[in-house]
Amino acid sequence: MVHCPRCHRPGAAVLCADCQYWQQLLPWLDGQAQHLFAYHSPIQTYFERFKRQGDYQLAAVFAADIGDWWRTRRRHYDAVIPVPTDPVRARQRGFDPVTALFASVLPLTPVLEKQGTTLEQAQQDRATRLTTRQPFIYQPKRGVRLRQWRRILLVDDIYTTGSTLYQTAAVLHAAGSDAVMDTFTLAR
């Protein structure tokens, strides 16, 4: 299957419109977007139950798949940074879905926080997602040496337009990182 070389969106073997948009805004960003599954009906149903209905037990369903993916790539990354969830939604749900999906398998280094409450991605159209104001901030942690990391893996649950992942990369870059930043999501 032919796809965008950066985000793997099905289509032509050239950068898709979303990746071209982000390349213009963040020309220094040259990482790759990786995912395990296409976001189709079974995965949509999974996320409906996991995130919308708050079925925490579903967090473990793909742990083996994520672990298999990670075993072949872990030596390439100095840090794995989870995309933070809106704290209000995490309290309502009872858990942070990104941490729930990845913490048992990946060595997460949470150095980002989401500030304020924003409309859920699922409730926004593509244009709104692409132009959402920066909701993330870098929170330095003791022992974390952001500037020493050469390659960072940003993890999130779903990749749609890339806006969330690009916004997190921009915050890390503004905080002094010049690392290559790849992304990994369960679904795209």
Language-model regions, residue ranges each:
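Glycine-rich phosphate/pyrophosphate-handling loop used in enzymes and phosphotransfer proteins
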Residues: 1-188
